[in-house]
Amino acid sequence: IVDDQKRPMFDSGSAVLKPYMRDILREVGSALLDVENKISLDGHTDRSPYSNDGRGYSNWELSADRANASRRELVSAGMPDEKLVRVVGMASSLLLEPDNPLSPSNRRISILVMTKEAEERLLGGERVAVDTETEPPTPSILPPKPALR
């Protein structure tokens, strides 16, 4: 989601939604209530490294926290929790502005309305046809290799 003024959804290093983002999410959430399809929610960060001495909390956790903060806002606005089928953090792996990886507009969420096929693949696993009529190869025992001298 990017608003028409290209404001960031989050401050740098924060998972707290900006007040205008709460309003936008409530509007988007209301519009999605009438859609039958399930929703996937992704959180994103810019490429600024999260300062934590290389341990623990990183842009991966931050992006997941952003996705969950957005999920909580959508649910508090009336979206049924079961409508959200996936909430995930993407860190800086899918930048909105790849030519400007530190751009504040990269600090965002993505809301995807899933097709029925994508939902089935995600929830039920993709079914793969297995050939049950072909005989498996017969195991064979190979002679031992001569020792190298």
Positions of PLM-derived features:
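Proteins with a high burden of low-complexity, intrinsically disordered sequence enriched in S/T/G/P/A and R
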Residues: I1-D3, P137-T138
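Mid-length scaffold segments of soluble, non-membrane domains
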Residues: D3, S14-D34, K38-L41
